[in-house]
Amino acid sequence: LAERQLIDASDRRNRLLRAQIDLWRQNPPVKRIVAAGTTAAFPLMKELVKTVLSLEKGELYLAGIDKFLEDEAWEKIDETHPQHELKELLDYLTVRREDIPDLQAPENFGREVLISEVMRPAATTEKWRDIAGKKIRHEAADGITLVNCADMREEALTIALLLREAG
């Protein structure tokens, strides 16, 4: 690539992100800047989100962040957990989950609590014994189907077929 005076896509992306970060730090925009829907999975993206939050009118919205999980369990999220990248981002930003505004109010509050419990970090599953105290209504499970699969291949095929039917 160097012989042809070219750079690869990730290098280009990083240069563009660095330029945007530097521009906003040197000349903060007066208009509203929103960072939304990112997990900021790589360092420069995290830095860009941090820069957005430092702006006078900078805002951050993260869809799908689990705000129902208690803090003790949140701290036990490991790299295998679906919320891990969001947790890493918030830790980097030193922002609490509660401080991230919701994009919209939950349509089914009970379902949100149920999903939070289902996705609870493995190190805290002893808390499942207390789930009755959360008063999750039966309607929270409406539309949810349990499919038992023999292996990961069958699971992947089942998911693919269900997504095809839904689409």
Label every PLM stretch briefly.
Residues 1-167:
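Nucleic acid-machinery interaction/catalytic patches
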